[in-house]
Design a protein with these regions (language model features):
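C-terminal accessory segments enriched in acidic
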Residues: 2-56, 60-70, 104, 195-214, ...
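Proline/glycine-enriched tight loop/beta-turn segments at coil->beta junctions
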Residues: 73-80
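Short, solvent-exposed loop/turn elements at domain surfaces
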Residues: 79, 92, 290-293
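Di-metal (Zn2+ and/or Mg2+/Mn2+) metal-binding site signature of metallo-dependent hydrolases
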Residues: 88-96
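Short hydrophobic beta-strand that contains or immediately precedes a catalytic carboxylate
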Residues: 82-85
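Conserved beta-strand termini and adjacent loop/short-helix elements that scaffold enzyme active sites
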Residues: 72, 115-117, 258
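Active-site/substrate-binding loop(s) of hydrolase catalytic cores
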Residues: 92-93, 108-246
Length: 377
């Protein structure tokens, strides 16, 4: 009898090990495929060239921190702009705004540089325990397009472990240890730092080398976050941002202007203005899939921005932006970013006498009442 019990226990142990191994293999394959997924971007006729970010820091070459920089040169000389399409890949409207520029637009005068995947490593994983979708899909003229819904931070496989306290360089400011993998806390970057700091360093060097006049960093945040539907500008860019914001408001786009805090370090709108000659502006839109009050985190929420829990929160005064049963669609969020870019270009011409002319940016109403797919290949 004792031997029979032992045999049964051994069998149960073996079965548990086999099941555990099977689950591990399946999960491992899923993680591996997602980490190595190649998102397709189809450059339009406006793209005149491209290069890898590692040209500005060879240590990035061959790593997941390297990423493509698209160049769109105009027929005539003019000012330049860098668009950081998505610093945080769980904020998809910036990514889609950048891709629509690359795929749909052309440049008449000046030069536009676009980095659709500013933190490339963060596209290779999701935030743990958030139950986020891996992908979202759009129907375009070329068929179903698949885009990655990634993480706010660099993949731990590329940069680990997080310190208890992250000390920003060169300010010496102490931040939460997890911020060491946040691209928007690492500027101006460190050439021999961790992967995130190296990516920041390369972007900063690109701005210096190309003498970028305007840098736009595109973001999203939860509807309950105070700095939302806003531009955040360095003091050097405040006049430019103010004028562009007024243009947007005349178009019916409700948006606010926030000054870059001089003592909060590592962010684009602070460090790029302090360490380069560019005029840095960060833009925020509302994204319910990014917030703490959301319900099911799925592809539908990412694209439509409709969530019953945020509707209830808004009714009770817990949202910082207007929110109703129509949600905040990907079209509305992308429209905000592209409208901001359009007016920043126009107002730069008014202030400095040289215009960056980007052709093909849809108006706010065209996107709001149409489909984002119309501006993708």
């Amino acid at each position: 009898m004792l031997e029979k019990i032992r045999a049964q226990k051994t069998l149960i142990t073996v079965l548990c090990l086999v099941i555990t191994l099977a689950i591990t293999v399946v999960a491992g394959m899923d993680f591996y495929q997602f980490r190595n997924y190649q998102e397709v971007i189809i450059p339009g006729e406006g793209v005149t060239g491209s290069f890898m970010l590692s040209e500005y820091l060879p240590a990035l070459k061959g790593t997941y921190g390297d990423t493509t920089v698209y160049v769109m040169e105009g027929r005539t000389d003019g000012p330049s702009m860098l668009v950081l399409g998505v610093t945080h890949p769980n904020e998809p409207s910036g990514h889609m705004a950048a891709i629509s520029l690359v795929e749909h637009c052309t440049v008449d005068s000046g030069t536009l540089y676009v980095i659709p995947r500013a933190n490339n490593s963060a596209f290779t994983h999701n935030d743990a325990q958030e139950a986020s979708p891996h992908f979202y899909h759009l129907q375009t003229a070329s068929g179903t397009r698949e885009f990655v819904f990634g993480s706010r931070a660099t993949n731990p496989l590329d940069q680990w472990p997080d310190p208890d306290v992250y000390t920003h360089q060169p300010s010496g400011q102490n931040l939460s240890g997890s911020e060491t993998r946040n691209l928007n806390r690492g500027y101006p970057g460190v050439a021999n730092g961790n992967m995130t700091e190296r990516a920041c360093y390369a972007i900063t060097e690109l701005i210096k080398d190309k003498e970028i006049d305007i840098t736009v960093d595109l973001h999203e945040s939860s509807p309950e976050y105070p700095t939302i539907n806003a531009m955040v500008a360095h003091e050097s860019a405040m006049e430019l941002a103010s004028n562009a914001l007024l243009d947007m408001m005349l178009d019916g786009v409700q948006i606010s202007l926030e000054p870059s805090p001089p003592t909060l370090h590592g962010l684009t709108h602070r460090e790029l203005g302090d360490f380069t000659d560019t005029l840095p502006v960060l833009m925020e839109t509302a994204n319910p899939s990014h917030g703490r009050l959301r319900g099911a985190t799925n592809e539908e929420l990412v694209l439509t921005g409709k969530d019953p829990y945020y509707l209830k929160a808004a009714e009770n005064g817990y949202a910082w932006v207007p929110y109703d049963e129509n949600g905040v669609s990907i079209e509305e969020r992308v429209a905000r970013h592209l409208t901001g870019i359009h007016y920043l270009c126009e107002e730069y011409g008014t202030l400095y006498g040289e215009t960056l002319s980007i052709v093909g940016i849809p108006s706010y109403d065209e996107l709001l009442n149409g489909s984002l797919s119309d501006y993708l290949n």
